[in-house]
């Protein structure tokens, strides 16, 4: 709900896809069973990756509206930096390759590419050429790490206890 007006949409307990690591609590044994945070990520999308792996293994994430957490967004990098942009682009490729059901990944790839093109255009027109170059650098780093991501995918998908349809529905 970051940046959204609170009109009561967050007042109910419910299951959600996952939580920001800055506000999440994980059962220790499950966290370690699934390999903890991917050390190749350093920052950005590590929580999305963990949420995916938990969902794939059949674990649920529960939202409690009474829980309060203060998370200083951007504390790692104060403003959108080239380093942050590069990490986001690189890690997003890994998250998708490691976790998305194969057919969903194929089906969504054209959309992912269009969104990337729009994002890069936005960097060029509304930000700076250095952010654009950082995004491109991150994208190519992500492409270079495809073999590593595919090896991790093999391990992750072995723990899968839910159907592709379940994952597709929870991603909507």
Language-model regions, residue ranges each:
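A cytosolic small-molecule/anion-sensing beta-strand core signal
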Residues: 20, 52, 65
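Glycine-rich phosphate/pyrophosphate-binding loop
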Residues: 5-16, 150-172
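Short active-site alpha-helical segment characteristic of glycosyltransferases
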Residues: 49-53, 69
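Active-site-adjacent helix/loop segment of glycosyltransferases
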Residues: 57-153, 159, 164
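Acidic/His-rich active-site region of diverse nucleotide-sugar glycosyltransferases
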Residues: 1-42, 48, 57
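Alpha-helical architecture
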Residues: 36, 44-45, 69, 114
């Amino acid at each position: 709900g970051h940046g959204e007006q609170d009109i009561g949409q967050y007042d109910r307990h419910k299951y959600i896809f996952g939580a920001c690591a800055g506000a999440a609590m994980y059962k220790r044994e499950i966290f370690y069973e699934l390999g903890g945070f991917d050390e190749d990520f350093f920052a950005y999308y590590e929580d999305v990756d963990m949420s995916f792996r938990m969902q794939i293994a059949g674990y649920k994430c529960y939202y409690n509206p009474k829980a309060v957490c203060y998370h200083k967004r951007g504390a790692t990098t104060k403003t959108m930096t080239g380093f942050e942009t590069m990490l986001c682009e690189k890690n997003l490729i890994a998250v998708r390759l490691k976790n998305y059901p194969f057919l969903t990944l194929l089906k969504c790839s054209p959309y992912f590419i269009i969104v990337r093109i729009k994002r890069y255009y936005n960097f060029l027109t509304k930000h700076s050429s250095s952010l654009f170059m950082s995004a491109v650098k991150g994208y190519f780093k992500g492409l270079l790490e495809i073999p590593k991501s595919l090896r991790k995918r093999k391990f992750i998908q072995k723990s899968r206890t839910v159907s592709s349809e379940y994952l597709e529905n929870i991603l909507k």
